């Protein structure tokens, strides 16, 4: 995996759409950086892995609290 990923690449990895990735970056849940003259957004691979790890932790907390596991 390259060190910096485009938003479409992140969307493909997470199996979501690009607007959802933009929303994650905008909210600060997923750290991104603007690089280059056109200000293209990139997400560093370690930031994506950290986001995924936090998602696992939050999911575990919800399951332990009795949340249903669906689809």
Task: List each language-model region with its residue ranges.
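Major-groove DNA-recognition helix of helix-turn-helix-type DNA-binding domains
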Residues: 15-42
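Residues at the start of alpha-helices and the adjacent loop-to-helix junctions
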Residues: 2-3, 24, 47
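Polyanion-binding surface elements
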Residues: 1-20, 54
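A short, Lys/Arg-enriched interface patch at domain edges and termini
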Residues: 46-71
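Compositionally biased non-globular segments, especially hydrophobic aliphatic-rich helices
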Residues: 9, 26, 68-70
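Structural detector for helix-capping/boundary residues
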Residues: 8, 28, 45-46
